[in-house]
Swiss-Prot record:
It comes from Homo sapiens. Substrate-recognition component of the ECS(ASB11) complex, composed of ASB11, CUL5, ELOB, ELOC and RNF7/RBX2. This is Ankyrin repeat and SOCS box protein 11. It is found in: Endoplasmic reticulum. GO terms for molecular function: ubiquitin-like ligase-substrate adaptor activity. PROSITE patterns: ANK_REP_REGION (PS50297), ANK_REPEAT (PS50088), SOCS (PS50225).
Length: 323
């Protein structure tokens, strides 16, 4: 019993020493990170690289902060970029976040700079620490020209699930032309990303009507969204009635329930135009609508092209094509 206080005294000393050591180590990490930033701002690349090596371990030999080549690419200064390349600057220099000059050129939509970099050996599928490729950046900026050039040089149109998806980014921002180019290059129109869902689901979430319409025209599954959440669920949470009409015209199931057991109608704001639109579509569809859906289902995803080959009367053809 007499040793009790001594034991607890030593225990408290040990805990205090451990906590002090932990916070001291954390303070050093923070200090080194701030010092790295200081050297980057001052332009001392070698010292910044050395400090980054200490913090992050095995950094590639091709590491650099935002170099003059990055700046030229980001600002679309083609002559300056070509001059730097001619002087022997490595086109694959990357920042601490693995951002290359090609990433910068594509994010700015500077197709001439992107092409010059690619012609001089830039990695077309380089990935940043955030999982972004140059193609993702091109879709982010909405540069269809950059998207075409990247694909011409071998960019992967559809990437692994853990990487940022170019088509989802294009749809999210309403860049329909970029979306169509990717789909023409065999990207799965119903590709589901765990945190985002399918391209159609994203289009409905962000109310990109043009993208919703085009995806449905090209055969996107009208009920495939994010797990049990359908595109109609996503649209019901928003305020765009046109998206509701498009989805229901293409046969969206109003009775489908999500993981919480809710239908699209349950998610619509009370007494809103979206709720009214869903209520109006709850009844049995017209026979003509059922026939149209049946014909399109039989023709499959390529029905948009197949319908033209049936040589139907123009009014009927236009009806089947939702025109």
């Amino acid at each position: 019993m007499e040793d009790g206080p001594v034991f607890y005294g030593f225990k408290n000393i040990f805990i205090t020493m451990f906590a002090t050591f932990f916070f001291f180590k954390l303070l050093i990490k923070v200090f080194l990170a701030l010092l790295t930033h200081f050297y980057i701002v001052k332009g001392n690349r070698k010292e910044a690289a050395r400090i980054a090596e200490e913090i992050y371990g095995g950094i590639s030999d091709c590491w650099a902060d935002r170099s003059p080549l990055h700046e030229a690419a980001a600002q679309g200064r083609l002559l300056a970029l070509k001059t730097l390349i001619a002087q022997g600057v490595n086109v694959n220099l990357v920042t601490i976040n693995r951002v290359s000059s090609l990433h910068e050129a594509c994010l700015g939509g500077h197709v001439a700079c992107a092409k010059a970099l690619l012609e001089n050996g830039a990695h077309v599928n380089g990935v940043t620490v955030h999982g972004a490729t140059p193609l993702f950046n091109a879709c982010c900026s909405g540069s269809a020209a950059c998207v075409n050039v990247l694909l011409e040089f071998g960019a992967k149109a559809q990437l692994e699930v853990h990487l940022a998806s170019p088509i989802h980014e294009a749809v999210k921002r309403g860049h329909r032309e970029c979306m169509e180019i990717l789909l023409a290059n065999n990207v799965n129109i119903d590709h589901e990303v765990p945190q985002l869902g399918t391209p159609l689901y994203v289009a409905c979430t962000y109310q990109r009507v043009d993208c919703v319409k085009k995806l449905l025209e090209l055969g996107a599954s009208v009920d495939h969204g994010q797990w049990l959440d359908t595109p109609l669920h996503a649209a019901a949470r928003q305020s765009n009635v046109e998206v509701i009409h498009l989805l229901t015209d293409y046969g969206a199931n109003l009775k489908r329930r999500n993981a919480q057991g809710k239908s699209a109608l349950d998610l619509a704001a009370p007494k809103s135009s979206v709720e009214q639109a869903l209520l109006l579509r709850e009844g049995p569809p017209a026979l003509s609508q059922l026939c149209r859906l049946c014909v399109r289902k039989c023709l499959g995803r390529a029905c948009h092209q197949a319908i033209h080959k049936l040589h139907l009367p123009e009014p009927l053809e236009r009806f089947l094509l939702y025109q």
